[in-house]
Amino acid sequence: MKMEDPIVIFGKWAEEGKDLGMEKGHANSVKKMLEFACKERADLGKKFSFLDVGCGNGWVVRDIGENKLCGRAVGIDGAQQMIANAESRDKKNEYIQTDIDSYTPFKRFDLIHSMEVFYYLKNPSKTIKRICDNWLNPNGRLIIGIDRYYENFQSHSWEEKVGTPMHLIKEQKWKAILEKSGFFGVKTWRVNPSKDWKGTLVITGKTK
């Protein structure tokens, strides 16, 4: 089976309106991730900047952009069609079509979020290291959600079903990647598990 670039796949999904299904399917997990991250920002009581990595149609950026403490909300995505969908729905916030593997922001962020993106990247470890070194402000937080990981056996067949390359990494390996990249206080947990579904794996850590 010939594998396609993930950007091509997601571009097609955007054109077909599947981005709305992705939004609905990920909403509960993302809500819990953002509740955790935004409570921390609220406790600090300071304005913060936000980046969504793999923003799709911009639904998370739009949501965080309404937070009274959010001074700037940005979404990046590799698929131009996704960015077009985001910009058509939102004139307030900022969207950038870019290669996530090589992107470097001109201004650092306080909170970086990503849902269902990092196992598609060519080199997740390298990108996470760059996020720690170059994307986040001191005392910034990265929070990632993924549904495809080794312990979630239902996700093992996705690469073949979707037809695009995907990493399959164990939970403790994801934690180790963040720690090796320079993040501290790294934690993992799972949200919305069910009988045959291990739930979304959340990995998060802070910069010094």
Predicted features and spans:
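Conserved S-adenosyl-L-methionine
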Residues: 183-194
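Short alpha-helix
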Residues: 166-181
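A short glycine-rich, Lys/Arg-flanked "PGG" loop and its adjoining helix->strand segment in the class I
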Residues: 125-138
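Class I SAM-dependent methyltransferase SAM/SAH-binding core
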Residues: 51-102
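Conserved class I S-adenosyl-L-methionine
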Residues: 1-42, 63, 150-151
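Conserved beta-strand signature within the Rossmann-like core of class I S-adenosyl-L-methionine
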Residues: 139-146
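A conserved beta-strand element that flanks and buttresses the S-adenosyl-L-methionine
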Residues: 113
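Short, glycine-/aromatic-enriched active-site segment of Class I SAM-dependent methyltransferases
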Residues: 147-165
